[in-house]
A protein has these predicted regions:
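Acidic, carboxylate-rich catalytic segments that either coordinate divalent cations
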Residues: 92-124, 240-287
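A structural-propensity feature for long, helix-poor, extended segments
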Residues: 47-92, 193-250
């Protein structure tokens, strides 16, 4: 997506490396959707800066259509439903890799998703659902809190992270607050995708997937080893990791979500908790 738009934002790319497999292989919203929605926002960065909340609302509508298309084309939007495996078990990881049909299916879906997103380039998204007031966000709020407390952050990522609101474009998937915590973690420990050599990529893949299985993490701090703990702590506090379960409702669009979030003391608390979980992990593993 970044290469198609000609706007390379390596730190933004680094931030989403832990969203693979539905948030640290937890089976939630497919990483192809998370990355694609973020890419849609990046494609329209100038419109976002020029038109503000109206463009952001339009981006959310476009990202929502992308999520809907993906679900219709491939039958599901979550990793657990698409792969049918549990990456936190040896048998699940082996089934995904061998004989290779499920992994190859994911690769084919990635290729189709890229073609879909490519066809969106150049589309005018300057006008969306009418909205007034200062908007509230999930992932962006967590990213801001973590940056203020730890100094770890990225301005561009904070601008674009609104796409995770309401479980990614209001579709009820991965909670935006948890997504924000994981992206903050990845700014510190994520993979530098463009500069990774092949052997480093394989080494990181193996270490990350082993760390999903063992109690004592191996090697240097890496996204999956630390990220699984963030997901676990968040799930213990919220009971779930997906917006539809946490909020117990669906959202019709920008204004509906803003009204809900403005009145939800519970979600405000989860946002603060997600930021605290991320800050604690960063403090522990960067020392």
């Amino acid at each position: 997506m970044q290469d198609m738009s000609g706007d390379r934002q390596d730190r933004v790319l680094k931030s989403v490396t832990g969203l693979e497999g539905g948030a640290v292989a937890s089976g939630s919203t497919c990483g192809v959707l998370s990355g694609g929605a973020l890419g849609i926002a990046l494609m329209h960065r100038e419109s976002l800066r020029q038109y503000g909340v109206h463009a952001a609302s339009a981006v959310m509508e476009e990202a929502g259509r992308y999520v809907d298309w993906f679900g219709e084309a491939f039958g599901a939007t979550t990793c657990r439903a698409r792969t049918g495996v549990d990456f936190y078990t040896v048998s699940g990881q082996l089934r995904y890799l061998f004989p290779g049909d499920r992994m190859m299916r994911c690769l084919r879906h990635i290729a189709r998703a890229v073609r879909y997103l490519h066809n969106l380039s150049g589309k005018d998204l300057s006008r969306g659902e009418t909205s007034t007031g200062q908007p509230l966000h999930c992932a962006a709020s967590v990213l801001r809190l973590v940056r203020e407390r730890t100094g770890i952050g990225d301005d561009m990522l904070e601008e674009l992270a609104f796409v995770f609101d309401g479980g990614l474009a209001f579709r009820g998937g991965l909670c935006g607050a948890l997504a924000g915590a994981l992206m903050a973690l990845n700014l510190a420990f994520g993979n530098e995708v463009r500069s990774l050599r092949y052997h480093r990529t394989i080494k990181g893949f193996v270490a990350g997937h082993i760390n999903l299985l063992v109690k004592s993490k191996i090697g240097m701090p890496e996204p999956f080893g630390i990220g699984r703990e963030i997901v676990r702590e968040f799930r213990e506090q919220a009971g779930y990791i997906e917006c539809r379960d946490i909020a117990s409702r669906a959202f019709t669009g920008w204004d509906d979500f803003q009204t809900y979030l403005a009145g939800s003391v519970y979600c405000a608390g989860l946002t603060a908790s997600a930021a605290e979980i991320a800050c604690s992990a960063l403090k522990e593993y960067r020392s």
